Amino acid sequence: MKNYINTDKLIKLYDDLVQFALDDIVARIVQNEAITGAAEFRIWKLQQLGIHLEKIKDYIKKMTKFSDEEIENIFKTAGITLYKPVTNLFIEQKTNFPLNIEASQYFRDVFSYYLSSTKGTVQNLTRTTAISSQNLLINKLDQVHFRVVSGIQNYSQAISEAIDEIGKSSLKVVYPSGHQDSVDVAVRRAVVTGVNKCFSDLNLIRAKQNGYNHVLVSSHLGARHIDNPSPEYLSHDIWQGKVYKVDWDTVPFVKI
């Protein structure tokens, strides 16, 4: 039996991200009459997503009414050129991607990860346990998750916008256990945890594909400490900042 793949949801996720980035670029150009550093970065990201530079220019022209000459001068002043992907920086890895999206290998890996980790539904990317009836929350979290993973928006911007939008129609987020959280707490937790999980899984996948057997776990000040924890990993300061050998036979993997 062939696995179900919700291509409509995947395409919508992609289209929403592209449209968000294009509108943000236009707003910054109109405000500054130049391409700012943030706009330049988003143009670079859009090209990685498979959007040709000329398509980006056409959209800017359509929305700003600038002439071709004005747009070319703006891009020339900013020094923006056609994106050329860097290959073989790591061992080249191909994925069987189900959609005809000419994105960079990183984004194709992210999309494939979404498909595998959600069993093709591309739903609830942050793995929030909020009750399924809270569709506005779950759909917005999916959108925000992809904006952060893609690099189009940073954590604070994405979380702030999500809280503003969701907060207009929902005062509390309810979980199956009956526990309730305020919108800002639920959104922040879901986005940060979901993005970290995505990056962690992709790093492990790439490490295994490239034949690496050791990992260095990051560390930070103020890590949780528990006296005589059971199990031991509950006290984070015990295991952070160390090198570990990975037993790949025991690690559960999402395949991409």
Q: Predicted segment positions?
A:
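Domain-core detector
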Residues: 1-255
